[in-house]
Amino acid sequence: MNLKPVLFSFVAFSFILACTHTKKISKTDSMVIEEPSIRLDTIKIVADEPIKKDIYKATNTKLSDIIHTKLWVSFDWQKSQLIGKAELQVKPYFYPTTMLYLNARGMEIKSVKLAEKQVKALPIKKGSKSVVVEDIFIEKPVTYKYENDSIKINLGKEYTSKETYYITIEYISKPNEIKEGGSGAITSDKGLYFINPTGVDEDKMPQIWTQGETQSNSAWFPTIDNPTEKMTNEIYMTVENKYTTLSNGILVDSKKNTELIRTDHWVMDLPHAPYLVMMGVGEFKKVTDEPWNGKEISYYVEKEYEQHAKAIFGKTKKMIEFYSTRLGTPYPWQKYAQIVARDYVSGAMENTTATLHGDFVCYQTTREIIDGAKGESTIAHELFHQWFGDYASCESWSNLTLNESFATYGEYLWEEFENGKDAADDHSADSRFGYFAQSAQKQVDLVRFDYEDREDMFDAFSYNKGGQIIHMLRKYVGDDAFFASLKLYLEKNKFKTAEAHDLRLAFEEITGQDLNWFFNEWYFAKGHPELEIKKTYDGTLNKLTLTINQTQDLKVSPLYKLPVYIDIYANGKKDRKQIWIEDAKNTFTFSVNYKPDLVNFDGEKQLLAKVDFAKTKQELIFQYKNAAKWGDRDEALTFFKDNSRDIEVYELLKIIAVNDPWRKFRSKAISILNEVAKEKESEIKPLLLSIYAKDVNTRVRASALKALAANYKGEDLNALYEQALNEQSYAIASEGFDAIANLNPELAMKKALALENEPSKEIIYSIMDLYSKNGTDANHEYFKKAKKQFSGFELMSFGNLYGKFLKRCTKPETVIDAAKLLTKMASGDNKYVKYTAQKVMKDNLINVWQSKEDKLNSQIEKLKKENQDVTTLTSDLKVITDTKKQIVDLYITIKK
């Protein structure tokens, strides 16, 4: 599951090393072992207060094992309900049992029956001695108790692990009647979602989709809803002929029942976890791409995006080939499909063979992709999950990082392969920043058994920090050993569950090393290293001395063992040294015949640590020019940001803006040069014009145009901004429009009319920003149309600008229409969007019109005291009061 579009961004980890698993022995157990008696002195222990036990979230105990789940489902769109029948093939996991416990949330259970398969020999024909063997099922009702979202089924006899039985349950799933939960990462846990089921919202395609992680699929089919479970499954989905369906595995049959109704039969014949089962239903258009090794690759999108589907998802086949080769493990599943859903409650979800993306993650037109494919890293993340998370799964949510850190690192691997090392390191730096931001809020272990809510595991620790740790492990063991270890881990744990120690054992088997030290400090402890580094050079003795102190709080974090490279640049050469930092205070000396130009700590820029190592301007200039890694150049640019007026830095920044191989560093240099752009107009303006004309990247060109607009005026530039409106790049066009809006709002209002039909969100934001500052009631229709382009968390940004605009509106019909739009906006499942709609309605409509009412009341009272005529004002007051009342009534409905 990818959370970045949701939050997140959405940290660090701890573990209890000495825990033992115990089995309770019941009175009915056949064996009782008596320990020898030992007489001990009596010791009286008195506690001042009760001793609190630490929370320990144990891996789920396996009592029963679902072998196969078969579902028959149809849908009542009007009621947002699923009518279902489930047939579960079950056996006791190991110990004999007379009971079966299933998770089933918010259901109406119609019946529960048990069947046993029996073999019966029947004569081929009357009087014949030849027989045919048939499997027959003897079905009978069983007693059960359904409470607390669980079905407790009495099997009527004891079954052993060698016996299989079948449970059939008829039920109605009522997801909208479930007491809804969720978290910042996954905002709802209803499991089954009917989006605009009655079609009341003409802007949103009616659809059904599911979200199983963490344990929400039991809201639409009875199961053992836990990551320890693995099963095969199939599903018969009865729908109207106009709808397309998607589920796990292969569509083996589609049977027409009537002129309007058909049943699709999907079969998943490889085992996976219940939370990975999915359904999608709607008037989706299926776009089929070139297969990979005979396996179908397909994309399910709304009609408007059918022509763009291959532009959005077209690298999927290349990704599958890359990951299959890199991991030494061919893509293991039957097909790979991706579907895009409206009002999705997270970012994306790695359902086996059928990933679901929120529309705000992936939907772009082919023209928008000119400026960059915004969903590419998410597509890579979810695909990598098909190996790490689906093929080999974490055995418990405590070990979630085995799923999410690898999917996060899958993003890095793809960026590295497809877009180069700079792109990968830049992506990694964003992830590292997300971890450090959350680590300032809390400190937890990577693998943690003491979480209060399993949803808490979906954070920047399981994702971001875990991905950084995997990268450090790769750098420590080397690429060959790293990928060989991953191959072994996947082979040993395929179609099974694993914990962090299984990963360690795979690496140890390949490398021959004991890696407990690495896993103990990174997987089973909190925090990260904080290093204070100082250097001295003795020219007489030709000795370089480095002192490196670990300054992290050792009451919270461990004393780390850190293998790291030191690159020493002297006399035109680079000399690499490996050191091991193991103590709180460490001193290293090196023989260096010349005074170093630069001592570069962590030459691979792979260490997850806060590092305090002061460098001079000359060292950082040298570092930028000679230490080529992304992290080296980024560190230098960070220093240059506050020193742009230094002549050496200034001259180098001009070179960076043109020549740095990484487009974001070129843009960053342009941004830094803004500080001196006005005082250096004769040099900077021509430079920016040249970059705008020649740079190959549209984002860099847009940065140059933005800098020109921020610093200079002139007819030549005005013409340039108007020309920019005709660029294919929306990034450039929006910067041109913003420049016109800042210089000449009246002209921008006219130019906006020609751009109002553009689907680009960058253009839409620019126009909405203009209208929020200069618009009138007449521009409200644009906001209504623009809203159709936003969904999910994007609606929060839309709401912010919409609210500012509504303060400018004066007509009752406009604000009542706006209140209705906000009511519709609040009708989805995203609680953050609901909050945004409520806040806009209260702050920008109710409070504004309350203020109008109060002001007019005061004016009327004053005029009455002066015996003035207030007939017109009283009439105006009635309009305002009635308007406010209608808004308040709508507000009350969305607050319920």
Regions found by a protein language model. Give the residues of each.
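Extended alpha-helical scaffolding segments
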Residues: 797-875, 879
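Amphipathic alpha-helical scaffolding segments comprising HEAT/armadillo-like alpha-solenoid repeats
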Residues: 613-623, 646-658, 678-692, 712-725, ...
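Non-catalytic accessory/interaction domains
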Residues: 211, 239, 262, 287, ...
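Hydrophobic alpha-helical and helix-loop surface patches within well-folded domains
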Residues: 23-29, 109, 115-117, 266, ...
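Acidic/His-enriched low-complexity segments
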Residues: 19-334, 460, 475-477, 493, ...
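Structural detector for internal amphipathic alpha-helices that build alpha-solenoid repeat scaffolds
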Residues: 605-609, 633-645, 655, 664-679, ...
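Bacterial Sec-dependent N-terminal signal peptides
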Residues: 1-30
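Sec-dependent signal peptide cleavage junction
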Residues: 19-60, 854-896
